[in-house]
Amino acid sequence: MAVNTLLSTAPSRVFLSFPNPSPNPSPQLHSQFHGLSLKLTRQSIPLATAPKPLSVVAVTKKAVAVLKGTSSVEGVVTLSQEDDGPTTVSVRITGLTPGNHGFHLHEFGDTTNGCMSTGAHFNPNGMTHGAPEDDVRHAGDLGNIIANAEGVAEATIVDTQIPLSGPNAVIGRALVVHELEDDLGKGGHELSLTTGNAGGRLACGVVGLTPI
């Protein structure tokens, strides 16, 4: 009841007084309402907390291609890439004749006409054929894999021109193993600068993303 009486008799005017600036790091704001005093300090106003720093998490991408052909040649190729780093290609192909065999990434993942419909080597930069370590090469030039006496070729290839994402991603394209050795563009044959004179296409498989 005392509070109600006080408010009902209080004048309608409100007087605010501000102290002179002082070195006090917590200045106060005084408000007088007919005998009532309210003090505000900077500490009484909650401040927004600073955002937490962002953490960068490595992104791993993986893909696989299952190679099949009209002969007994078959195999599995897995590809993996960390962030924007090089792509690691793990190859295991069986049924080959012993020796070197050209191994390339081709432009299309179209196998409606077998390996012949996979197109030419993947070549987004318009280069001539070369070795994987050459500056001038097709992006799809992965060199040779070597089959042992049992016809099994196992290899690990690390390459920077066959990413699993981005405008030149290899997803949906095809890996092809060839009949002959790739001359890496240095054989002097009329096909050296286009196919490496690697002969027929023994088996192929479309590159597709796989769960990590």
UniProtKB/Swiss-Prot annotation:
It comes from the Eukaryota. Pfam families: Sod_Cu (PF00080). Gene3D superfamilies: Superoxide dismutase, copper/zinc binding domain. Binds 1 copper ion per subunit. Binds 1 zinc ion per subunit. Residues 1-58 form a transit peptide. Its EC number is 1.15.1.1. It catalyses: 2 superoxide + 2 H(+) = H2O2 + O2. It is found in: Plastid, Chloroplast. Its main location: plastid. GO terms for molecular function: copper ion binding; superoxide dismutase activity. Homotetramer. Belongs to the Cu-Zn superoxide dismutase family. This is Superoxide dismutase [Cu-Zn], chloroplastic. It comes from Vitis vinifera. The gene is SODCP.
